[in-house]
Amino acid sequence: MRIEIITTSNEALKETGFGTLKACNNVLDSIRRLGYSARLNVCETAGDLGDIVKRKPDLVILAVKYIAVEHGDDIWLSDYFKNNGINFSGSSREVLKFDSDKVLAKSHLRKNGIRTADYFTAIPGQYTCESELPIAFPLFLKPLDAANGNGIDDSSFVTNFADYESKLLWLYNLFSLPVLAEEYLDGREYTVAIINTLSSGLRVSAVEVVPPQSAHGLRILGEKVKKEDSEELKKAGDNELMNRVRKLAVDAFFHLGARDFGRIDVKVSTSGQ
């Protein structure tokens, strides 16, 4: 089997998937150790993708969702390789939209009976005082469509209207989109990896994610922490809470229509909800 890994320069992307060169090289080494022919491609243009199509690999592993094109439309890789008759890893573009749009994902999951934190979206000036806000403080503010902690830091946690307005304006100016405001959940945080295989079925692995404590006494899994890779990962045990965390992640995986693999982040309140 001939396998090719596809990634791109990450500077122009709001989200990177697992597309960093370090991660891609780790995947490349693992595939080669299994005895398969493998190649890593850092693609920048449609021409780069065309060269891959000409080689007709048996499988392409998509480490990013799209290639950003300056002064043009982004090239969504799942669509591109599907249209060219080449098998690809991961989910379709329709499913990947849930990964890019947090509100779309939340509303879809809620319609299917899966709990998410209460939320609303806002732009500067939409609400003029605390009493108008749909949810009471404390709130957590984040970009609508960015991943990898982009735009998230200690100031994302807001407890009063002045701080809310300040962070809202900053995010809106940076991303030019409405801002997502969520109820703040003050419990533990987990990430659940899911792999769905034909040979061995569903594999589910969860770890607890513990960000370092900041100078303000907060533990926020934001952009700085993720870039520095300074969070601690703790093995999740087998208990009633972890069984519920894993079940929630698996339910979300299937209701979102994901295939092959995914990673679901789960935050718990101090009451265990």
Labelled PLM ranges:
Residues 89, 117-118, 204-207, 221, ...:
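A short, local hydrophobic-aromatic micro-motif
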Residues 1-88, 94, 99, 125-130:
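ATP-binding N-terminal substructure of ATP-dependent carboxylate-amine bond-forming enzymes
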Residues 2-7, 25, 53, 98-180, ...:
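Active-site nucleotide/adenylate-binding loops and adjacent lid/helix of ATP-dependent enzymes
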Residues 42-44, 121-123, 183, 262:
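Short loop/edge segments at beta-strand edges and connector loops
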